[in-house]
Design a protein with these regions (language model features):
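Auxiliary Fe-S-binding modules of radical SAM enzymes
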Residues: 1-29, 197-306
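N-terminal [4Fe-4S]-dependent radical SAM core
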Residues: 1-68, 72, 76-81, 301-303
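Short Fe-S-cluster ligation motifs
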Residues: 40-61, 95-113, 285-287
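Glycine-rich active-site/cofactor-binding loop and its immediate structural neighborhood
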Residues: 65, 69-103
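Residue-level detector of family-conserved "landmark" positions at structurally sensitive sites
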Residues: 81-84, 110, 137, 285-288
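Flexible, glycine- and charge-enriched loops at secondary-structure boundaries
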Residues: 86-90, 177, 181, 263-267
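Positions that flank functional sites
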Residues: 89, 115-116, 292-293
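Conserved AdoMet/S-adenosylmethionine-binding subsite of the radical SAM
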Residues: 95-259
Length: 306
């Protein structure tokens, strides 16, 4: 990995499970769309995460450009798939973190940060030296390597991770990742081992731990049941080792209609998923209301804060 003053830029990138080998040091982009220069699309207080993340003051959220998944229904597709964002320096990212802290954020929330891990770690080092003291959230689609999870040790306090699928066929069709579950399962286990059981401050704001999300998809609740089976197995083995969050907010963005999911989930479908979660002993987490499936909950990627 050739080094700049602050960052070791991959010359054969293996940061995500695709291990595409892109020479990012030479400015080439990988499968994720990321090259040699850090890129972000929004940095602002965000109020629509789980209550223990957003609290009353908001989560200091930075949306990074690019993504290691290619979800056909992605609500953030302008930044994840179409490259929207502004190139920034590591030093500027550190100042963004400090600005969000000064605005009263409960935490720093890194959205799809995996493809920029070395850059973000360098920025966190700078920001910490200048007084950053907030918990750091890794907001990830779950498609990670165990090695990348380990590389975040000492930097990430809270994992806000998806478990999207169990079915290889479904993850191939909807996210171009037939190995999604094979990669996500050990990665999530590494997250739980690293973070430990959830811990909260006096205001009920999460300080460390794992929130494990699942977004129920229309027409695919059988795979939701399989996901919940895996969540239940983890919870049975170590009760309270994570906070489950079952979401109904699916909205058919981007290319969803081309893949047979061009509608919202029905109340009947979501009730079946929630009831299954309850039956599996996952009642200690969050269950979204159907009213959350609204486009206005999607942030505007207008380069605010970057």
């Amino acid at each position: 990995m050739p080094k700049t003053d602050l960052v070791s830029i991959p010359s054969s990138c293996t940061l995500c499970p695709r291990r595409c080998g892109a020479d990012r040091a030479a400015g080439r982009t990988g499968f994720c769309g990321a090259g040699s220069t850090l890129k972000a699309a929004r940095a602002a207080l965000h109020y629509w995460e789980e209550p223990c993340i957003s609290g009353t003051k908001g989560s200091g959220t930075v949306f990074f450009s690019g993504c290691t998944l290619k979800c056909c229904f992605c609500q953030n597709y302008p930044i994840s798939a179409e490259g929207l964002g502004r190139e920034i320096t590591v030093e500027h990212l550190a100042e963004i973190f400090l600005s969000l802290q000064s605005q009263g954020a409960h935490n720093i929330n890194l959205v799809t940060p995996g493809q920029w891990q070395p850059w973000i770690i360098a920025a966190l080092d700078i920001a910490r030296a200048k007084g950053l003291r907030l918990p750091i959230v890794c907001n990830t689609g779950g498609y990670e390597t165990v090695e990348s999870v380990e590389a975040w040790r000492g930097y990430i306090d809270i994992w806000l991770a998806d478990l999207k699928y169990v079915s290889s066929a479904l993850s191939a069709e909807l996210s171009s990742a037939p190995d999604y579950f094979a990669q996500a399962k050990p990665a999530i286990e590494a997250m739980m081992a690293q973070a430990g059981h959830p811990a909260f401050d006096a205001e009920g704001i999460l300080q460390k731990g794992v929130i494990l999300r699942h977004l129920a998809l229309p027409g695919h609740i059988d795979d939701s049941f399989a996901v919940l089976d895996q969540m239940a197995a983890w919870n049975d083995a170590d009760p309270g080792c994570f906070i489950p969050s079952v979401m109904s907010q699916y909205t058919p963005f981007y290319k969803a209609a081309e893949h047979g999911i061009g509608r919202r989930i029905t109340t009947y479908e979501y009730r079946r998923v929630v009831n299954y979660a309850m039956d599996k002993g996952l009642a200690q987490g969050y269950m979204q209301q159907k009213s959350s499936a609204k486009e206005e909950y999607t942030p505007s990627f207008d380069l605010t804060g970057v």
